[in-house]
Amino acid sequence: MKLIFLSGVKRSGKDTTADFIMSNYSAVKYQLAGPIKDALAYAWGVFAANTDYPCLTRKEFEGIDYDRETNLNLTKLEVITIMEQAFCYLNGKSPIKGVFVFDDEGKESVNFVAFNKITDVINNIEDQWSVRRLMQALGTDLIVNNFDRMYWVKLFALDYLDKFNSGYDYYIVPDTRQDHEMDAARAMGATVIHVVRPGQKSNDTHITEAGLPIRDGDLVITNDGSLEELFSKIKNTLKVL
């Protein structure tokens, strides 16, 4: 099973490339942002159950029939509450270093130092709170920058190893947004493919939307024509793997 990591800014054709491979080859897909969406969908469900906020399911966090840039009009205190719940969800999947303590009855809670760190990070963010901004805050501003830089890579590695002998020809990771994630992928023997649309730049200033550098050994698909031309380039690229 060949491991492929895709990279590209918004609207570069990266997701179209992943979908084409999934539809036309024996392939399985893993999203690094999948656990982020899972955790926030769970946390939102707990939070919104006692408020007048709208119901947002996993589908909305995936962006299906929903604009993830929509302002949710959350206060910072409400965001902190959501993040606490998201941390609890994630810790149940794979422990987050230095976050949780247990009381005499065995009940789990966020420790004082970790809570202060979460609070400080959220209080220093002045952006409007949308689904996308919640994802960036949990995935990068909190977990990667303050608790465990390799946390999302570890979750990917567990899934990859579980599927290693599953019979698929390709294992696709379509949403790599940080250099350390891509470095880990290269170390694991992944083929890195950058999908580039000339002149396409992201207006999102968050680090996860800045695009990644092309390293020696990486492959590049230039998406500068029709869909049919893009599909032809994908086929030709996969032939050389």
UniProtKB/Swiss-Prot annotation:
EC numbers for this chain: 2.7.4.-
UniProt binding sites for Mg(2+): 42, 85, 108
Known regulation of activity: Inhibited by pyridoxal 5'-phosphate and diethylpyrocarbonate.
Catalyzed chemical reaction(s): dTMP + ATP = dTDP + ADP; dGMP + ATP = dGDP + ADP; 5-hydroxymethyl-dCMP + ATP = 5-hydroxymethyl-dCDP + ADP
InterPro entries: DNMK, DNMP_kinase_N, P-loop_NTPase
Keywords, in A-Z order: ATP-binding, DNA replication, Kinase, Magnesium, Metal-binding, Nucleotide-binding, Transferase, Viral DNA replication
Top-rank taxon: Viruses
GO MF terms held by the record: ATP binding; deoxynucleoside-phosphate kinase activity, ATP as phosphate donor; dGMP kinase activity; dTMP kinase activity
Binding site for dGMP: 10, 36-37, 68, 132, 139-140, 144, 152, 175, 177-178, 181, 208
Cofactor: Mg(2+)
Assembly notes: Homodimer.
Homology family: Belongs to the dNMP kinase family.
Function according to Swiss-Prot or TrEMBL: Allows the synthesis of deoxyribonucleoside triphosphates necessary for the rapid viral DNA replication. Phosphorylates dGMP, dTMP and 5-hydroxymethyl-dCMP (hmdCMP) while excluding dCMP and dAMP. The phosphorylation of 5-hydroxymethyl-dCMP represents the first step in the replacement of cytosine by hydroxymethylcytosine in new viral DNA genomes.
Protein name (record): Deoxynucleotide monophosphate kinase
Native source species: Enterobacteria phage T4
Gene: 1
